[in-house]
């Protein structure tokens, strides 16, 4: 089920005539792209810096894509997650055309598409390119990257969130991790496994950002029954459920988490876990791929469990790093060639052959999860990753009805700023420079500056 268009908010006013004109200028059929220079030219691709990008996509672009398409030169602009979002929004909102391809996710894609900032991949390219096989994309991921039924960003990888744990440490302590643990159970495990100065009982995101500490915290808030706004768009950050969940998360880190947690997000925690310094780690399912390829010894001792819950049946987030083409960019045909290559079944084959099948970007295609080579190589985490993704429900992320879509975000343009602001306050609470109560009061005040009409798009 695709998110209702009425619930997707615009980031700002963009002239419909200009957007339609740009669309018409780009349109034509064929998988080779829409422009006369579809087989040549230089394209710049803005991407997030993480192992699947820097360790696979970028080198394979040089060794494979540019050899297959010698007339196309690919340049990369690599950013941290927060910097990437700022650079891309500036690029698309001002139509600077600095990037021919942009890496975005389910939060940005429908909002950008509604504003006319993205090329409709379904109509522009996929409709005349049956070899791309968009029907093979995992439904939750494809729906999250669509607007009014059309795909506007092609998924490079998809993810939910889950718990990673060190089986050796659990066995030594006489502990057993359930497949579907509760947060209370996790807290008990962390208390028993914590070895200050040596091994953290649990590692969690603390770095400020709506896609950093707030991504993990939001899943806790949801399963505790909290929400960002009620059905009248009144902020709920100081509600009992939101407060209880935040206190739980912050206290869990401060008591049993890694030192300096307020500076840590995915990349830092991957390193800590790979070094054996985390008894448990709650984060993106895609981390399983990075652990398998980067830390093979730790991979052998790693167990996996679903995202912990409290009052809900499931709580994992839903995300994808995907590739979109800004509306009206030059060399759009070459851009599509790159997007279709990097998100294809053939790319999966290429990665599997070169890096091993456990290294293939997960969470995008149904065919990957029926591939015997992948199932064999990624057996420990393949099925639980797929289960985690399929159990997400961005339209109903918490116990009560909400006026927004999103598990770890709220699908309004104001959330990018609001999520960062609240994330900064939570990072302060984790660092001990303010209390959780102070952090949430500040967050409530920040959310209250927006009127219901602004948030609802009315």
Language-model features: where?
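C-terminal lobe and pocket-closing loops
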Residues: 287-298, 311-321, 325-420
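Glycine-centered hinge/linker elements that transmit conformational signals in sensory
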Residues: 189-192, 232-263, 303, 307
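Short helix-initiation/N-cap motifs at beta->coil->alpha
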Residues: 78-88, 107, 181-188, 260-274
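Hinge/lid segment of periplasmic solute-binding proteins
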Residues: 106-160, 213-216, 303-308, 386-390
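Conserved N-terminal structural module of periplasmic/extracytoplasmic solute-binding proteins
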Residues: 2-117, 127-133, 262, 311, ...
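Short, solvent-exposed loop/beta-turn-alpha elements that line the ligand-binding surface or hinge
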Residues: 119-137, 179, 202, 206-207, ...
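Extracytoplasmic/periplasmic solute-binding protein
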Residues: 147-156, 161, 184-235, 241-242, ...
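Conserved C-terminal helix/tail region of periplasmic/extracytoplasmic solute-binding proteins
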Residues: 2, 171, 392-458
């Amino acid at each position: 089920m695709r998110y209702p268009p009425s619930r997707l908010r615009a980031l700002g006013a963009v002239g419909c005539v200009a957007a339609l004109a740009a669309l018409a200028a780009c349109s034509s059929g064929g998988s080779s792209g829409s422009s006369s220079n579809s087989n040549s030219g230089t394209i710049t691709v803005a991407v997030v810096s993480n192992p699947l990008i820097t360790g696979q996509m970028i080198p394979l672009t040089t060794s494979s894509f540019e050899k297959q398409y010698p007339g196309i030169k690919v340049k990369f602009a690599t950013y941290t997650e927060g910097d990437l979002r700022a650079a891309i929004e500036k690029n698309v909102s001002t139509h600077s055309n600095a990037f021919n391809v942009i890496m975005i996710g389910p939060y940005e894609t429908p909002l950008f598409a509604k504003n006319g900032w993205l090329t409709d991949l379904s109509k522009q390219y996929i409709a005349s390119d049956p070899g791309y096989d968009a029907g093979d994309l995992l439904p939750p991921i494809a729906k999250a990257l669509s607007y009014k039924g059309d795909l506007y960003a092609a998924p490079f990888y998809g993810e939910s969130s889950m718990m990673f744990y060190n089986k050796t440490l659990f066995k030594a302590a006489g502990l057993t991790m359930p497949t579907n643990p509760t947060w209370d159970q996790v807290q008990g495990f962390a208390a028993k496994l914590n070895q200050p100065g040596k091994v953290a009982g649990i590692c969690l995101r603390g770095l400020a950002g709506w896609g950093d500490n707030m991504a993990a915290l939001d899943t806790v808030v949801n399963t505790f029954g909290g929400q960002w706004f009620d059905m009248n768009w009144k902020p709920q950050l100081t509600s009992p459920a939101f407060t209880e969940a935040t206190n739980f998360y912050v206290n869990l880190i401060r008591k049993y988490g890694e030192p300096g947690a307020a500076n840590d997000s995915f990349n830092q925690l991957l390193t800590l876990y790979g070094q054996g310094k985390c008894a448990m780690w709650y984060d993106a399912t895609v981390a399983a791929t990075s652990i398998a390829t980067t830390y093979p010894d730790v991979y052998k001792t790693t167990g996996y469990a679903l995202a912990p819950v409290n009052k809900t049946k499931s709580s994992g987030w839903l995300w994808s790093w995907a590739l979109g083409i800004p509306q009206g960019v030059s060399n759009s045909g070459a851009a599509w060639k790159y997007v279709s290559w990097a998100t294809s079944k053939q790319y999966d084959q290429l990665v599997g052959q070169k890096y091993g099948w456990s290294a293939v970007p997960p969470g995008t295609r149904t065919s990957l999860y029926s591939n015997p080579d992948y199932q064999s190589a990624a057996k420990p985490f393949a099925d639980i990753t797929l289960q985690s993704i399929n159990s997400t429900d961005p339209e109903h992320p918490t116990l009560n009805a909400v006026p927004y879509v999103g598990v770890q975000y709220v699908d309004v343009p104001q959330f990018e700023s609001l999520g960062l602001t609240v994330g900064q306050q939570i990072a302060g609470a984790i660092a001990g420079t303010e209390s959780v109560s102070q952090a949430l009061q500040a967050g409530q005040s920040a959310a209250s500056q927006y009127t219901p009409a602004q948030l609802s798009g009315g």
